[in-house]
Amino acid sequence: MTHTLDDRTELLRELLERQFTEHTDQLTELTLQSRQREHGGHDPDTLRRLVEVAQRGIADTAQALRRMSEGTYGICEGCGQDIPTARLEARPSARYCVPCQQRS
C-alpha cells in the first residue's frame, strides 16, 4: 500500500500528538513522584534528569507540531533540503537531516 505525502504527514502528526501526550503524562507522574517522601523510588538527581528529559520531549514535539502547522515540517533547518521520510518516521521531531545532525 502506498501512502501519499498527505497521508504520511497525517500519520506523523498522529504519532507526534501521541508522543506529546505520553511525555505530558510522564511529566505529570514524575512531578507527583517528586512530591512524595521517597520520590517514587528514584533518587532526587535521577528524578530531576527524568523530568528534564520529559520536558525536552514535550518541547521537541510541540516544535514539530508547530512546524507542521507552519508548513516547514520535514525541511532540514541546516541545509533546507527535505528530511527523508524514513528519518521522520524514526524520529518525528527531527529538525535536521542526518548529515546536518552529525555536523552539529
For every predicted segment, state its role.
Residues 1-70:
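Interaction interfaces in information-processing and related assembly proteins
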Residues 93-103:
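Cysteine-rich micro-motifs
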Residues 56, 74-77, 95:
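Cys/His-enriched microdomains
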Residues 36-40, 78, 84:
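Acidic interhelical loop/turn segments
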